[in-house]
Amino acid sequence: MLKKLALLAIIAPALANASWLEERRCSNIYEAGFATGLYSGQCGVSIEATQQKYEPRLAQALNKHNCAQYNEKNIAKLKQNTETLKAKYLKKASAPNFCANYEAEIDKLFRKYE
């Protein structure tokens, strides 16, 4: 019994850290989806085209990392930080020639968290 408790004491921090990392990764995937919508809107790409191209990839990343358990928390976080995130991503999207390369920016965001 003492050995099991000692082992649990060693493993518990690693498990807690893994859970935190998983939650953070899911939060970043949600943010990447938010940025994708902003970038597309800024560059005049239709919502339908954006959804058709990126929704499957976003869903795959969310499923891969088991993000369903963090849905409510991440949606609340996005709502709370909407203005800050808009400022962050629209500033980037206002750069010259951004729209010519916006798909590369979106790919970069997704690759970072997939």
Please identify what each model-predicted range represents:
Residues L8-A18:
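Hydrophobic h-region of N-terminal signal peptides that target proteins for export
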Residues I47-E114:
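Compact alpha-helical subdomains of small soluble proteins
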